[in-house]
Amino acid sequence: MWKASAGHAVSITQDDGGADDWETDPDFVNDVSEKEQRWGAKTVQGSGHQEHINIHKLRENVFQEHQTLKEKELETGPKASHGYGGKFGVEQDRMDRSAVGHEYQSKLSKHCSQVDSVRGFGGKFGVQMDRVDQSAVGFEYQGKTEKHASQKDYSSGFGGKYGVQADRVDKSAVGFDYQGKTEKHESQKDYSKGFGGKYGIDKDKVDKSAVGFEYQGKTEKHESQKDYVKGFGGKFGVQTDRQDKCALGWDHQEKLQLHESQKDYKTGFGGKFGVQSERQDSSAVGFDYKERLAKHESQQDYAKGFGGKYGVQKDRMDKNASTFEEVVQVPSAYQKTVPIEAVTSKTSNIRANFENLAKEREQEDRRKAEAERAQRMAKERQEQEEARRKLEEQARAKKQTPPASPSPQPIEDRPPSSPIYEDAAPFKAEPSYRGSEPEPEYSIEAAGIPEAGSQQGLTYTSEPVYETTEAPGHYQAEDDTYDGYESDLGITAIALYDYQAAGDDEISFDPDDIITNIEMIDDGWWRGVCKGRYGLFPANYVELRQ
């Protein structure tokens, strides 16, 4: 145990024989006041009544500490005057590039509900391939996940397996035989190279931009020391080879441009007195020029260019213009267009059937009338030939037994067949307005043709025998008979187009229908008879029959 207590100062307390600890010193003075006696002794630390905290002093201390802390932060922290344009914002070289001023207006992006998200992803329905986002992939895209590091074959790219595939060696990879050369330290480098070599005697290695100690830089003269007489003709202006081309001397006299009132404007307009024709301005006109004003629309003669006046100047005829006599004839195979709905409906079929029946009846009536007319003409022609033959026989009989009267005038001997061909002369195409003239009335007796009912027992005189030249009048009467038949129908016309009556006083007709008894009451509207009805119809829908 003595080893444990070695090196320590051991103090042993002595027993005082049981002295009383409460015994006071003989010189003790009780200097405790009444207040200290009541609130505790000052000799005992922490005893007694503690005083309350002074709030005003505490607030003042906190304010002083806060002020000191703020001043310290302003001194050590970043200053707001730097980087934002300097003090007062006028130092542009210190302006922060990423800072914007109060005039900056930021453009807010649209809300998701306002953005048209169909753009840029193939357009609407994804079919606009030209608007497909290049970085967007569709649902058919299959991303290939990269292999884990444990799955990769690192033997490739480093010389292949076992390092013998030299064509696969990585260019940036070095092998174990590579020996890297460490760069020398700054203290080991020889800086004598490049500045003239060692000792500055290798002139071929001298740095071009380096100068030696013998170099003496010439300071540029001040503006007040420069001689500006060079370059403007040299000193005293006598060195003309050094004269500035753009500089003018004191002997230069600038010629001012003449005022508008002083210029001679007679040049370029024919010269002086207007006789220099080669100098005359081509676009200038003289005082003898008379401007001809264009005529008003009401004064222009629009007869030019459409065949000239009265349409007789063929060389001025407009190639694209057509005359009034060029009427496009509608082909006879015209068929009235029927809508598809009308073809399928039964009512329209019935109506079409009735219309077809009516057309067929009209065509049959027309054919019957033409056949009856042809038969009547053939019958009348046969009767005329018989009457002519009888007259010729009577003439021959009279010629064989002439009477005792004075000798008659000689009768021209005509071949018997000549009267037959003579009847072709009166049959000529007559104009359509023939029916409007009064019909000449020819009696059958005057023509020398007896009636069919009174041929028997009728004695013929010799007067028609010697006046056989009046026989053509009979055929003229025949034509007049047919003209009278046509004149009963009045002016006729044939329909070019179909027309449906729009009112009760109008008539309807189809193409190729014949309108008779036409009355031209107006230029655009006529009145006539067609299909048993009498009324108005447009004149440009029909064509008059010749």
UniProtKB/Swiss-Prot annotation:
<feature type="modified residue" description="N6-acetyllysine">
    <location>
        <position position="235"/>
    </location>
</feature>
<dbReference type="InterPro" id="IPR035716">
    <property type="entry name" value="Cortactin_SH3"/>
</dbReference>
<keyword id="KW-0256">Endoplasmic reticulum</keyword>
<dbReference type="GO" id="GO:0005737">
    <property type="term" value="C:cytoplasm"/>
</dbReference>
<feature type="modified residue" description="N6-acetyllysine">
    <location>
        <position position="87"/>
    </location>
</feature>
<keyword id="KW-0832">Ubl conjugation</keyword>
<feature type="modified residue" description="N6-acetyllysine">
    <location>
        <position position="161"/>
    </location>
</feature>
<dbReference type="GO" id="GO:1901524">
    <property type="term" value="P:regulation of mitophagy"/>
</dbReference>
<feature type="compositionally biased region" description="Basic and acidic residues">
    <location>
        <begin position="357"/>
        <end position="396"/>
    </location>
</feature>
<dbReference type="GO" id="GO:0060491">
    <property type="term" value="P:regulation of cell projection assembly"/>
</dbReference>
<feature type="modified residue" description="Phosphoserine">
    <location>
        <position position="418"/>
    </location>
</feature>
<dbReference type="GO" id="GO:0045987">
    <property type="term" value="P:positive regulation of smooth muscle contraction"/>
</dbReference>
<feature type="region of interest" description="Disordered">
    <location>
        <begin position="1"/>
        <end position="28"/>
    </location>
</feature>
<feature type="region of interest" description="Disordered">
    <location>
        <begin position="355"/>
        <end position="424"/>
    </location>
</feature>
<feature type="modified residue" description="N6-acetyllysine">
    <location>
        <position position="107"/>
    </location>
</feature>
<feature type="repeat" description="Cortactin 3">
    <location>
        <begin position="154"/>
        <end position="190"/>
    </location>
</feature>
<keyword id="KW-0728">SH3 domain</keyword>
<dbReference type="GO" id="GO:0005829">
    <property type="term" value="C:cytosol"/>
</dbReference>
<feature type="modified residue" description="N6-acetyllysine">
    <location>
        <position position="193"/>
    </location>
</feature>
<keyword id="KW-0254">Endocytosis</keyword>
<dbReference type="GO" id="GO:0030516">
    <property type="term" value="P:regulation of axon extension"/>
</dbReference>
<dbReference type="GO" id="GO:0030027">
    <property type="term" value="C:lamellipodium"/>
</dbReference>
<feature type="modified residue" description="Phosphoserine">
    <location>
        <position position="405"/>
    </location>
</feature>
<feature type="modified residue" description="Phosphoserine">
    <location>
        <position position="407"/>
    </location>
</feature>
<feature type="modified residue" description="Phosphoserine">
    <location>
        <position position="417"/>
    </location>
</feature>
<dbReference type="GO" id="GO:0097581">
    <property type="term" value="P:lamellipodium organization"/>
</dbReference>
<dbReference type="GO" id="GO:0030838">
    <property type="term" value="P:positive regulation of actin filament polymerization"/>
</dbReference>
<feature type="repeat" description="Cortactin 2">
    <location>
        <begin position="117"/>
        <end position="153"/>
    </location>
</feature>
<feature type="modified residue" description="N6-acetyllysine; alternate">
    <location>
        <position position="144"/>
    </location>
</feature>
<feature type="modified residue" description="Phosphotyrosine">
    <location>
        <position position="442"/>
    </location>
</feature>
<feature type="cross-link" description="Glycyl lysine isopeptide (Lys-Gly) (interchain with G-Cter in SUMO2); alternate">
    <location>
        <position position="144"/>
    </location>
</feature>
<feature type="modified residue" description="N6-acetyllysine">
    <location>
        <position position="171"/>
    </location>
</feature>
<dbReference type="GO" id="GO:0030863">
    <property type="term" value="C:cortical cytoskeleton"/>
</dbReference>
<keyword id="KW-0966">Cell projection</keyword>
<dbReference type="GO" id="GO:0098885">
    <property type="term" value="P:modification of postsynaptic actin cytoskeleton"/>
</dbReference>
<dbReference type="GO" id="GO:0071933">
    <property type="term" value="F:Arp2/3 complex binding"/>
</dbReference>
<keyword id="KW-0488">Methylation</keyword>
<dbReference type="GO" id="GO:0008076">
    <property type="term" value="C:voltage-gated potassium channel complex"/>
</dbReference>
<keyword id="KW-0175">Coiled coil</keyword>
<dbReference type="GO" id="GO:0005905">
    <property type="term" value="C:clathrin-coated pit"/>
</dbReference>
<feature type="modified residue" description="Phosphotyrosine">
    <location>
        <position position="421"/>
    </location>
</feature>
<keyword id="KW-0965">Cell junction</keyword>
